[in-house]
């Protein structure tokens, strides 16, 4: 200000010009700063909205993942692990009169099974359909390794027959799964021999509710009988036993012919 007082007109003009330039410069700078700010604000808004979008997506995927895991848990809880296996094995029946003929082709009989094997429950539920070439009865068989029981439901008679599980005949579920795997892959020679069981229905069982849920479901509301091996029967009226039938199945790498007789 003091300087201005001594300024010549040219100096004043110069000063004005300088001020003009400064004003211009400062305006430009301000505009630049403003533009920068606006830009920054604009980019921030953009980042903000995409961030919100990401969060929403993340949240949604968490909810979805939760639903999937929850659903899987509920499914696993309510639907026990089980797989249905199908298999066929053939056997040579030396007692079949057709096979005792000399020079005749050996007559192999097929046995087909459908098995629901539940390793978690230690149980095998075997369905024997109506056989096409033999006199065996269709049946549903339960081998319950937890309860140590076998139940035969003869589907022609509608009766249940129960006996202790014979672990030297029946393979554990894990090995049965392997056997069916081998049968399915065709790597296994499905020709085998027969083991015969001769059983007698000795007494009626009125209450099957203490034999496990699986046997209960199979045999509840049906006539149920306890089976005994004929060779272990002492003092039993053997002549009174007249009706017999067979169930052929494979609880192992061989066929078991279960003959059940009843008065
Ligand atoms: C299991 O079955 C086999 C073959 O039939 C027999 O030799 C064995 O005595 C049976 N075991 C029991 C406990 O019945």
Curated annotation (Swiss-Prot):
The chain crosses the membrane at residues 54-74. One of its GO terms (biological process) is plasma cell differentiation. InterPro entries: BRICHOS_dom, ITM2. Disulfide bonds join 160-219. Pfam families: BRICHOS (PF04089). Residues 133-227 form the BRICHOS domain. GO terms for molecular function: amyloid-beta binding. It is found in: Membrane. Keywords: Disulfide bond, Glycoprotein, Membrane, Signal-anchor, Transmembrane, Transmembrane helix. It is a single-pass type II membrane protein. Glycans are attached at residue 166. GO terms for cellular component: Golgi apparatus; plasma membrane. Belongs to the ITM2 family. PANTHER family: INTEGRAL MEMBRANE PROTEIN 2A, INTEGRAL TRANSMEMBRANE PROTEIN 2. This is Integral membrane protein 2A.
